[in-house]
Amino acid sequence: MREKSRLKILICLLTFVGFLAQGEARTVNVAVPTLNMVVIAFTVAKEKGYYREEGLEVEIIWMSAPVAAQALIGGNVEFSTVSGAALPAILRGAPLRFLFTTYNRPMFWLYAKPEISDIKGLRGKKVAVSGIGSGPAHLLIEILKKYGLEGGRDVALLGLGVQPNQYAALLSGSVDAAMMAPPYNVMLKEAGFYELVSFLKEDFVELQGSMIIRQELLRSDPALVERFVRGTLKGFRYARENRSGTIPILVRYQKLREELAAKYYDLVRPIMTLDGTASEELQKKFLDFGTVRLGLKESPPLQRVFDYSLTRRINGQLEAAGWKPEK
């Protein structure tokens, strides 16, 4: 117990000293594709003050997946959570790394107008995705292949940006189907739209809610990265272990009814990673999927894409200190 107490004090002191050294809170910009449960580790960390404890003022900026990837590469944001767009960039040579991951399955559902009751009914139709080349777009292309359809030829893919745009397009009838994430899938179900595919049930790996960073920042300011990872891990642990405390945060961020937020939480909680990392098996599966979709001959070594060492180290520190999220 004494050792744990000492470690708790040490972690607090290091955080405090780092904060004093900065003089004021350091602003950090994070690109996210949506403000839903996908980025819950980050929104909880902000709401519960875990980033402030690290001397960080975190700005969560909503942008489409392709724009988020370019913003990260260009240095306009320090971190991104958009794995589906970041992976192709890495495979094409962008110096980015995955440091942390919230989910290991794709949190997407393919919803269609009520009159379309199977995937083959999408032939000649229009389907909304966040962006051409995004993770959801490629998941859609793969599922269409299983039913003998080719995305872009038999089924038109329209990149409409963020989830509310896609949701509105399906409601208005300007598209026939859309790749939806919670809570929009639940809302569409309540409105009578038809669920064609739940990607939670398909054999795909999608490392959603990840933390992606430029290698240059990892080298030039490792202290900043460590503080951000620590704050995020605390947010992740809170969200994973505290259902009753997380649901109100979903309600505030997404202006949801409490009942809908609870359904949403319960739907995706089972696919959260255990500790913010992905096993090598899952890393390889995710990487191989990206390699195939880009038409590359072989996948690069895992270490060129993933580096969970800092997340594991900070997890160990929190465990040793006996840190638990408040109830």
Regions found by a protein language model. Name each.
Residues 2-10:
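Bacterial N-terminal signal peptides that target proteins for export
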Residues 10-19:
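Bacterial N-terminal signal peptides
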Residues 19-25:
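Sec/Tat signal peptide C-region and signal peptidase I cleavage site
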Residues 26-162, 166-172, 176-182, 193-205:
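Short, glycine-/small- and polar/acidic-enriched structural segments
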Residues 32, 102-112, 191-221, 225, ...:
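Periplasmic-binding protein-like
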Residues 84-86, 164-254:
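Pocket-lining segment of extracytoplasmic ligand-binding domains
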Residues 219-298:
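Secondary-structure end/capping motifs
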Residues 291-327:
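Conserved C-terminal helix/tail region of periplasmic/extracytoplasmic solute-binding proteins
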